[in-house]
């Protein structure tokens, strides 16, 4: 199937997003170095293999946490990494390997053998067993090109000059994770805690299609130089993912490979962070904010998308109900098509709200329901009420609606009026180009 956009149009769209969302510099956490290489798995000499190394050996090395896909057909790298993480109890992790172009998913015993061989190659080089984790992304149902992977890994690991902890190295790593992405996703920030300790967070992610995680194809990594206990790190990451990567949808499909890792190198000389540390809630909030920014970049890069949409559900009885309503709206193909067509079809939004699988139906009371469009981009500050106290606005200002829906950014606000909890979910529209990209995916 041929694309509805010309190659020139696709390139122009990609260039625009690259200029808008890719940084030109950054700060990066101590205790890491990263490298990447083109093995030939991807076409045209594109980077397709990367390695993150923990270089600080405080109390045995980096602590680790992870959140994996809940898809029943878990990919071989997910299975292999879960086993290693369990053995290590989140301590002493030395490396993370990421490859793109082949997901190594639904590949049976051979796929698992190949995944284990990849990590063993790294562990042999480093001289440390059961300390390497793996991420893979690409076409499902195909085996890894082990000759290319093995040669690429050997070349990379034997070249110290290929590794660094600078902007160029991290940007190249994020490029090595890309498949249908139009731009690499890299964020870094530096924070100072109340006691005066300054630390750094860096996050990278990939994803543009098959995005509706419940921890799509979505991969991510967050690194920090703080010393954090494994249990505290898992608490931080799980909470952050639940409010970020688990609150995005491009197409409603959950991948076999979803993986988010977080490593804490401990290179900053400060007390170990645990759940009882005074700074723990603040660090947790800062990691969540970074994860949300990373997750939003995935949606902004949604395959064929023209709009970035925030679905804000507020005044629900509980967070779970707010989230399921926001997710149901975000996953609705009819809502997404209406957004692409710039059609203020609020009936589709109400329909989605009505079939949301709520844990407590008391969260939804038709008489207190309010739904509106809120301008975010050029229409910032504008609001269009679609439903007020359960009564539809039959005299919608179509001209105002058209102006708001023409923006690239939009917010849909659903006020349930039954409680105090809220949730933000991020989605995009569904275009002809999405179909073209995925119809041509393996060609």
UniProtKB/Swiss-Prot annotation:
Coiled coil segments of this chain: none
Enzyme kind, highest EC tier: transferase
InterPro entries membership: Arg_biosynth_ArgJ, ArgJ-like_dom_sf, ArgJ_beta_C
Main subcellular location of this protein, as a coarse class: mitochondrion
GO molecular function, one term: glutamate N-acetyltransferase activity
Annotated EC: 2.3.1.35, 2.3.1.1
One Pfam family hit: ArgJ
Record note on modification: The alpha and beta chains are autoproteolytically processed from a single precursor protein within the mitochondrion.
Site features described as Cleavage, chain residue numbers: 216-217
Known catalytic reactions: N(2)-acetyl-L-ornithine + L-glutamate = N-acetyl-L-glutamate + L-ornithine; L-glutamate + acetyl-CoA = N-acetyl-L-glutamate + CoA + H(+)
Location in the cell: Mitochondrion matrix
Keyword Acyltransferase belongs to the record: yes
Keyword entries, A-Z: Acyltransferase, Amino-acid biosynthesis, Arginine biosynthesis, Autocatalytic cleavage, Mitochondrion, Multifunctional enzyme, Transferase
Catalytic residues of the enzyme: 217
GO cellular component, one term: mitochondrial matrix
Xref: PANTHER family: ARGININE BIOSYNTHESIS BIFUNCTIONAL PROTEIN ARGJ, ARGININE BIOSYNTHESIS BIFUNCTIONAL PROTEIN ARGJ, MITOCHONDRIAL
NCBIfam families in alphabetical order: ArgJ, PRK05388.1
Additional remark text: This protein may be expected to contain an N-terminal transit peptide but none has been predicted.
Assembly: Heterodimer of an alpha and a beta chain.
Entry function: Catalyzes two activities which are involved in the cyclic version of arginine biosynthesis: the synthesis of acetylglutamate from glutamate and acetyl-CoA, and of ornithine by transacetylation between acetylornithine and glutamate.
Family the entry assigns: Belongs to the ArgJ family.
Protein name, entry field: Arginine biosynthesis bifunctional protein ArgJ, mitochondrial
């Amino acid at each position: 199937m041929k694309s509805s956009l010309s190659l020139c149009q696709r390139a122009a769209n990609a260039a625009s997003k690259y200029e808008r969302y890719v940084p030109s510099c950054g700060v990066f956490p101590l205790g890491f170095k990263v490298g990447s290489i083109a093995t030939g798995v991807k076409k045209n000499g594109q980077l397709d293999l990367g390695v993150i190394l923990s270089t600080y050996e405080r109390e045995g090395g980096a602590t680790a946490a992870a959140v994996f896909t809940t898809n029943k057909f878990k990919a071989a790298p997910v299975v292999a990494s879960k086993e290693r993480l369990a053995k290590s109890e989140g301590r002493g992790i030395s490396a993370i390997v990421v490859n793109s172009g082949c997901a190594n998913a639904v590949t049976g015993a051979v796929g698992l053998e190949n995944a284990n061989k990849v990590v063993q190659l790294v562990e042999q080089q480093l001289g440390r067993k059961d300390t390497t984790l793996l991420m893979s992304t690409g076409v499902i149902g195909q085996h890894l090109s082990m000759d290319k992977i093995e040669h690429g890994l050997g070349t990379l690991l034997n070249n110290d000059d290929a590794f660094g902890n600078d902007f160029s190295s991290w940007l190249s790593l994020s490029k090595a994770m890309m498949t249908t992405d139009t731009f690499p996703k890299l964020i870094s920030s530096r924070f100072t805690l109340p006691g005066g300790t300054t630390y750094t967070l860096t996050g990278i992610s990939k994803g543009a299609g098959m995005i509706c995680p419940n921890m799509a194809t979505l991969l991510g990594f967050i690194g920090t130089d703080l010393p954090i206990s494994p249990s505290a790190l898992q608490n931080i990451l799980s909470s952050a993912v639940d409010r970020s990567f688990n609150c995005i949808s491009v197409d409603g499909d959950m991948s076999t490979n979803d993986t988010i890792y977080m490593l804490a190198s401990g290179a900053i000389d400060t007390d170990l962070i645990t759940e009882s540390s005074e700074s723990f809630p603040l660090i947790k909030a800062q990691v969540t904010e970074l994860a949300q920014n990373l997750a939003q970049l995935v949606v902004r890069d949604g395959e064929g998308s023209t709009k970035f949409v925030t679905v804000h559900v507020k005044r629900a009885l509980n967070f779970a109900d707010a989230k399921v309503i926001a997710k149901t709206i975000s996953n609705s193909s009819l809502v997404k098509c209406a957004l692409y067509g710039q059609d203020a079809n609020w009936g589709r939004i109400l329909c989605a709200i009505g079939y949301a699988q709520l844990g407590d139906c008391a969260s939804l009371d038709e008489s207190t329901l309010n739904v509106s469009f809120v301008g975010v981009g050029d229409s910032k500050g504008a609001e269009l009420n679609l439903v007020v106290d359960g009564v539809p606005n039959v005299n919608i200002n179509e001209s105002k609606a058209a102006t708001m829906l023409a923006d690239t950014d939009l917010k849909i606000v659903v006020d349930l009026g039954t409680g105090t909890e809220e949730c933000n979910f991020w989605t995009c529209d569904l275009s002809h180009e999405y179909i073209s990209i995925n119809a041509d995916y393996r060609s």
